[in-house]
Amino acid sequence: MAYSTSVIRRLAPSEKFFAETQTFTSITVLLDGTVDIDAMADAFDALLEAYPVYAGHLEPDSDGGFELVADDLLHPGLWVQFEGDPAPTDQLDQGVALIYLLVKPDSTPVEVTLFIHHSLADGTHMAGLLFELFARYTEVVTTGSAGPVSPNPAPEPIETVLEQRGIRKQQRSGLDRFIPAMFAYELPPKRVTTRSAAERPAAVPTTRCRLSKAETSSLVKYGRVNRLFVNNLISAAILLAEWQVRRTPHIPIPYVYNVNLRALVEPPVSATGCTLAIGVATYLAHITPQTTMVELARGIADMFQADLADGVVQQSLLHFNMQYEGAIPGLPDVVLSTNLGNAVAMSTPPGLEVVGVQSQFYRASSAVIDVYSFGVVGGELLIEHHVDAAETTIDLIRSLLRSVVSEHQH
């Protein structure tokens, strides 16, 4: 049987890589209480009505790219997984849908996981959808209705957002900062993975650590005393840990990190108005045994402000695509991170409380992925390391951050 389809648009260059690797990103909300499955299904249906593009799918086009396609098929709906059931994540399929929802009602704590295709959503976009899902769920539980629904158009790619605002490609990309380190050192072997090429998306192993609310608060205060944001300190801790485990003290470390552009362009962009509203900032870290976390964090912060003032960060994705795999020839292994931001209180009905949040990548590729993500959830700092090679740094990062917290407290 043939179903009618219509092409919404082609994927832009910034989005294409994640279609090639079939990458889905997930956010899992950990909950204390009971989730009403029927109410969550109603809220999810309302979310799909409000953002119908995610009920569509991707199809290869004739030019080696991908098209975003709408069809008349119903979305398969949410998954419910009870203890002992097989995981439904092997059904993630960009040729069927671009969003999925999984509820584990009898796990402790209860888990609700939203999966979205990474071509169509960065972390901020995903958080916007997740917060709306829980707002509608709260409405269903407390009033019996998910609230009014007005369909939203498909989000624009970053290329269109920049063009509409007169932001054009400059000479510099930001990666030019790494040129002095290219082919300048005898490099150790590149990290490898035992993963074989997969036809369907598979979970990338993820290691996590947290700081308590008190530790996170102390870290924020420590940053203020030193005129630094927490993300600068976390970036410095990640780089110091990488420097220690690499055992190549004379080789600088290239650092690449995402920057949310939504509030940095005029007019600003809404959370769900653009697929990947990110720029890329870079830093080449020259670390010695005498390098302090504050010194390194200030170097990162100062370089970012300079590149932002010059407009380099805003137009960076017009030079290259954001990728989580592969290596630049002749360059030491790049450290890549993404800042999940500070999650404000999510709407929940009485008797249901958010006790944690975590993220995961699912992808079909045999290349090494190595990316850090971090953010503040419920007042607690969460740091994640998504890597399908040996993980050696997460405990060290936590230890480094706790050491400055302890220093500040005393």
UniProtKB/Swiss-Prot annotation:
A Pfam family of the record is PapA_C
The processes (GO biological process) annotated in the record are:
lipid metabolic process
The active-site annotation reads: H118 (proton acceptor)
The reaction(s) annotated as catalysed by this protein in its Swiss-Prot or TrEMBL entry are: 2 a mycocerosyl-[mycocerosic acid synthase] + a phthiocerol = a dimycocerosyl phthiocerol + 2 holo-[mycocerosic acid synthase]; 2 a mycocerosyl-[mycocerosic acid synthase] + a phthiodiolone = a dimycocerosyl phthiodiolone + 2 holo-[mycocerosic acid synthase]; 2 a mycocerosyl-[mycocerosic acid synthase] + a phenolphthiocerol = a dimycocerosyl phenolphthiocerol + 2 holo-[mycocerosic acid synthase]
Under Enzyme Commission nomenclature, its number is 2.3.1.282
Q: Which family does it belong to?
A: Belongs to the acyltransferase PapA5 family.
Q: What protein name is recorded for this chain? A: Phthiocerol/phthiodiolone dimycocerosyl transferase
**Organism in which the protein naturally occurs:** Mycobacterium sp. (strain KMS)
